[in-house]
Amino acid sequence: MPNSILFLLLSFLYLTNCVAQSPSQTCPLDFSHVLTIPWNTTDCQKSDKSADSKNSCCQSLLTLIGIPLAHRLKQTSNFRLPNLATSISCLNNLQTKLSSLSLSSNLTSLCFDPNQFVINNETCAGIQTTQDWVSRLGPSTALDSACSSGLTDLTRCDACVAAGFRVQKQLITLDGNSSHGVYCYHFVVTYAAGIVNKKGPESDDALSCLFSLSLRSPLNSKKKRHTVALALGITGAIFGALVIAGLICLYFRFGKAVKGGEVGWEDQGSRPKWRPNTGSIWFKIEELEKATNNFSQKNFIGRGGFGFVYKGVLPDGSVIAVKKVIESEFQGDAEFRNEVEIISNLKHRNLVPLRGCSMVDDDSESQRYLVYDYMSNGNLDDHLFPRGETTKMPLSWPQRKSIILDVAKGLAYLHYGVKPAIYHRDIKGTNILLDVDMRARVADFGLAKQSREGESHLTTRVAGTHGYLAPEYALYGQLTEKSDVYSFGVVILEIMCGRKALDLSTSGSPNTFLITDWAWSLVKAGKTEEALEQSLLREEGSGLSNPKGIMERFLQVGILCAHVLVALRPTILDALKMLEGDIEVPPIPDRPVPLAHPSYRMDGNGFTISPALSGLQIHSGDMLR
């Protein structure tokens, strides 16, 4: 019996000693922010339904882990967790928070390998601590001046992201293994959010720019903001109610006097009258009905933005195109007036001129019409991608070159030739019309938006066309001149490649869906000729081949303009100079993922590129800057 007791005692002491020597499984990361930050849980709610949702969900979760890692870096100088047991414990803690939000109980195991958060000497240039960072890169880097504050401003965020990629490049050079680029980028993000940014990892600066976390609503870090917003809202509501009441009174007093007539029209016979303050002609509806044969099907020539377009002939013999505006989700009286006011004051040879307009109100609906000069050669899209049995000769290289330059000049005028600048927001083939000489003119300013100098727009209503929308605008409503540059880049690629912006017929690699990814991958692989429209590579009737070097330059400018990062796109003026050969085209940059990109996921062997990067749905990581 004594021997049995001694054996049990020794066994107990042995097990106690083993537990004491085993690594601690207590997680040092605080995940309380998972419940306080208004992050968008939509993709995580349906992560089991599509690969895209899963990738977006995993991206959000990676950011939620990155926030406390940045906090810990500042507190302990350690970039990652000490061992596998700690990493597993932290992922379990995160999963507990996610489950409390009624999300799936296996999200962390679905998205992560615990090893990816454990530090080791081979992660990135042997860096484990901030001391290692300083010893490798020096006491300061480009991040220190670019990422310290003010990152909610798009321009400053651009500069910070560009600095991040420069530092990443330094780290990859030091490491010597380009496959570690993703890990190095995560280190850059963690350092910028935890050490450099003055407001910290949970600030608006870090969440909106560094981590690019998709939020349900803007962050308000102080209760005072809520109070002020509530007070302003109540005041605005009261004022709005008074204004509406006044308008109702005016309507009942004066409404009958104008009901059923053209707005802004004075009955002075059949001659059109110049409307004050705009310079555009206001037609009577009877004139437009006569010109278009009562908007007959025979005169119908296509559908443009927000309406149907009819060909017409005025009494003086001039041919016009009349757009009959139809009500839609985006268009109303305010936007119609906006279009008239903007277009009527624009005069440039590469813009479609507005001849006039008409607006009729009756009991059932408002009818609005825009009158343009008729462009006899239709739109660019019809020439690039003929429909049905229509046969058109492929555009020649001189024609393609001329069209690209014309569009660039038209956009340069909108961005720099008028004050305030105008952003078109819907540059695409169907909005580029061709006159009798095949010169291009930018059309359809129904979505145009004026800008105050030096400003970027933030809007909750994104307008435009899928495949041409700049990612930062499509995802976050951040509108700048570079948004038009992105769309212009896509149009260049369509012209040079003879391929649609979104090619849904393509099978195989998801990289082939988007023309931007497809063209970039071929050019980076040294297969530029495979990206060019085949008709451009054949010799013309004269026996002379097209200038391959110039065509490649145009293709490279298109890729550069359509880069997912705002900071790496040129302005339209610089793009025009590159096209004309006045300045050199910089080397085509990689399409690097922004800070914490959803397209990277872990498989059994390490990080791989996810098909979501080039899928039809663009996610928060695809865009930034």
Swiss-Prot record:
Catalytic activity reported: L-seryl-[protein] + ATP = O-phospho-L-seryl-[protein] + ADP + H(+); L-threonyl-[protein] + ATP = O-phospho-L-threonyl-[protein] + ADP + H(+)
Task: Give all residue intervals belonging to the Protein kinase domain.
Answer: 295-555
| InterPro entries reported for this sequence | Kinase-like_dom_sf (IPR011009), Prot_kinase_dom (IPR000719), Protein_kinase_ATP_BS (IPR017441), Ser/Thr_kinase_AS (IPR008271), SPARK (IPR043891)
* Keywords from the named record: ATP-binding, Glycoprotein, Kinase, Membrane, Nucleotide-binding, Receptor, Serine/threonine-protein kinase, Signal, Transferase, Transmembrane, Transmembrane helix
Q: Give the annotated active site.
A: 426
Against CDD domains, the record matches this protein to:
STKc_IRAK
- Protein name stated in the entry: Probable receptor-like protein kinase At1g11050
Organism name: Arabidopsis thaliana (Mouse-ear cress)
Q: Which Gene3D superfamilies match?
A: Phosphorylase Kinase, domain 1, Transferase(Phosphotransferase) domain 1
List the stretches on the Extracellular face of the membrane: 21-227
| Range of residues in the leader sequence | 1-20
Q: SUPFAM superfamilies under this entry? A: Protein kinase-like (PK-like)
